[in-house]
């Protein structure tokens, strides 16, 4: 009897000790995570309005870090990272326009497609317009839903380089402030095709340095010194990755994607594969294509979320998938300016 009691006390003592160790470990883990959150706040300049908001955001941050680490422990072709969106729930990220801003087209007026008769078998196996000097450095749209302007400008910067030999960083802010009489509404969203229409009517765009980006809507400033122009624009036939390849082989192309998935939110590197939505909400630019070391074919894309997102601001998404709409819908509404 005495031995049984002693054994019971020993077991209870072990359980209490284990519980204490686990509790201490949880406190230690929480303290480490809190310190990580503080470092993240400093890195991205995040300031919360009060302690309650900070506590809530910390819980979101902690959950997102757990998701990222769990995903990266799996068998995937790409990986995730803790970036500037780490204190947003996916619902917040998905429904906010502050980091995206593409408005899907309800009706697309048919245009020509100058690359229709290009022999796809004669195209290069890989294309990267960065190596041809046709891509400006990564930009950051910040808290303004004007991805449409960044996408249109990047595509225009590319064709201007290819047609004139000059790579010029052009003004997104001119579009944000001045292209407001149609579908495009500055930080509230817009369409790349409408941006191209405005640029044609406006006689071009001025430079980034002459009309710098402000990440906010403002009054249109009178600028008469447009430094680059386009003659028109064309839509790539929808839901046709082969047609998109023909276009991208010849110039950077604006594309729209569904950028709301958590894997897109926290994308860090590799070739994005797997399931993805097609509710288009974000405009980016296809600047090439290629094949990864494991044989996976991919599109090379330029985003406008700064260099801390993705592969220094760029993204690779699987190419030629079974869904004709393309990965995250990127083949649904591609277009490009003409010079």
Swiss-Prot record:
CDD domains given in the database record:
Peptidase_C1A
GO cellular component terms attached to this protein's record: senescence-associated vacuole
Entries under PROSITE patterns matching the protein? THIOL_PROTEASE_ASN (PS00640), THIOL_PROTEASE_CYS (PS00139), THIOL_PROTEASE_HIS (PS00639)
Coiled-coil residues are none
Using the chain's own numbering, where are the disulfide bonds?
Answer: 144-187, 178-220, 276-328
Positions of the catalytic residues = 147, 282, 303
Q: What subcellular locations does the record give?
A: Vacuole
Q: Which UniProt keywords apply?
A: Disulfide bond, Hydrolase, Protease, Signal, Thiol protease, Vacuole
Recorded hits in Gene3D superfamilies, A to Z, give: Cysteine proteinases
Which residues are listed as membrane-spanning? none
Task: Give the signal peptide as a residue range, or say none if absent.
Answer: 1-23
User: Which molecular function terms from Gene Ontology are attached?
Assistant: cysteine-type peptidase activity
Question: What does this protein's UniProt record list under function?
Answer: Cysteine protease that may have a developmental senescence specific cell death function during apoptosis, heavy metal detoxification, and hypersensitive response.
Name of this protein: Senescence-specific cysteine protease SAG39
Native source species: Oryza sativa subsp. indica
């Amino acid at each position: 009897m005495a031995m049984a009691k002693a054994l019971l006390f020993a077991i209870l003592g072990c359980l209490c000790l284990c519980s204490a160790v686990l509790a201490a470990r949880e406190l230690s883990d929480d303290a480490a995570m809190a310190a990580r959150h503080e470092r993240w706040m400093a890195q991205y300049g995040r300031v919360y309005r009060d302690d309650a908001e900070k506590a809530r955001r910390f819980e979101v941050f902690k959950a997102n870090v757990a998701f990222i680490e769990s995903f990266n422990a799996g068998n995937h072709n790409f990986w995730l990272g803790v970036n500037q969106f780490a204190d947003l729930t996916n619902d917040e990220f998905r429904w906010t326009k502050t980091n995206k801003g593409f408005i899907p087209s309800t009706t697309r007026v048919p245009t020509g497609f100058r690359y229709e008769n290009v022999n796809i078998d004669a195209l290069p196996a890989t294309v990267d317009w960065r190596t041809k000097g046709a891509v400006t450095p990564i930009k950051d749209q910040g808290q303004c839903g004007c991805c449409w302007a960044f996408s249109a400008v990047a595509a225009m910067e590319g064709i201007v380089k290819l047609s004139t030999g000059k790579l010029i960083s052009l003004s997104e802010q001119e579009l944000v402030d001045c292209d407001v009489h149609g579908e495009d509404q500055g930080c509230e969203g817009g369409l790349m095709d409408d941006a191209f229409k405005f640029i044609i009517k406006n006689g071009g765009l001025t430079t980034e340095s002459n009309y710098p980006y402000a990440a906010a809507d403002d009054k249109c400033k009178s600028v008469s010194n447009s430094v680059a122009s386009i003659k028109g624009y064309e839509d790539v036939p929808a839901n046709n990755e082969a047609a998109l390849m023909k276009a991208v082989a010849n110039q950077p192309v604006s594309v729209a994607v569904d950028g709301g998935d958590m894997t897109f939110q926290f994308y860090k590197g590799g070739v994005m594969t797997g399931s993805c939505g097609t509710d288009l909400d974000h405009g980016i630019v296809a600047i090439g294509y290629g094949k990864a070391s494991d044989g996976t074919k991919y599109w090379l894309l330029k985003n406008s979320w700064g260099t801390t997102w993705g592969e220094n601001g760029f993204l690779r998404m699987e190419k030629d998938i079974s869904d004709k709409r393309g990965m995250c819908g990127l083949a649904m509404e591609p277009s490009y300016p003409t010079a």
